[in-house]
Amino acid sequence: MELFFREYGEADKPPLIVFHGLLGSSRNWQAAGADLGKYFHVCCLDLRNHGKSPHAFPHSYEAMMEDVFVWMDEHDLDSSHFLGHSMGGKLAMKIACERPERLRSLIVVDIAPKMYPSSHDSEYEAMRQIDLSALPSRTAADRFLLEAVPDWGNRQFLLTNLAKREDGNGFSWIINLDALEENQREIEGSPIGTDHR
């Protein structure tokens, strides 16, 4: 799988690979990536089923880890520093536990290796109820999501996944809702086994 990525900093600096959280993308890390690029060669990846990367089943930590290793091999990286937020933090933990030789250091943001309660059901349902083919604007989508997602900031975050269709007929979600919903328990669960705790 050919993952999309954004890079910052000079290629001769130490590599730092950044993983976004669930429903996020490399776009979320543009400002931080530019700052970290003063010290590292920063590569912010779009993980499978997110951003500009391909859609694929399953959406599991094992599959995401293998995607990352393929990407690293294609870019001649034997090892790297890793920074992961939320779902991306769980992915980084899995790499640290299962393939420590590929890790130089680990930064995990806002997540622990444990099961979390489901928190996206109402958001997924509301996103699916929007008639994207007839949607006139992003503002209309924002109004539609208001009842299910009352927090303005959360709605704007979700709407970063809404893209105008190339043929001009409405919008589409850039995330793979089917894969994310089908693998929700996997995403919410611990990425590592009890032998790594």
What residue ranges belong to the model's regions?
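Helix-loop "lid/cap" segments that line or gate small-molecule binding pockets
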Residues: 126-132, 140-153, 161-163
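Conserved serine/cysteine hydrolase catalytic core
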Residues: 167-197
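Alpha/beta-hydrolase fold catalytic core
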Residues: 1-17, 37-40, 77-78, 182-185
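Flexible "cap/lid" loop of the alpha/beta hydrolase fold
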Residues: 93-98, 103-137
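Serine-hydrolase catalytic-loop signature spanning alpha/beta hydrolases and amidase-signature enzymes
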Residues: 12, 21-31, 42
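Active-site loop/oxyanion-hole signature of alpha/beta-hydrolase fold enzymes
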Residues: 6, 30-37, 43-83, 87
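Alpha/beta-hydrolase active-site loop signature
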Residues: 23, 47-51, 113
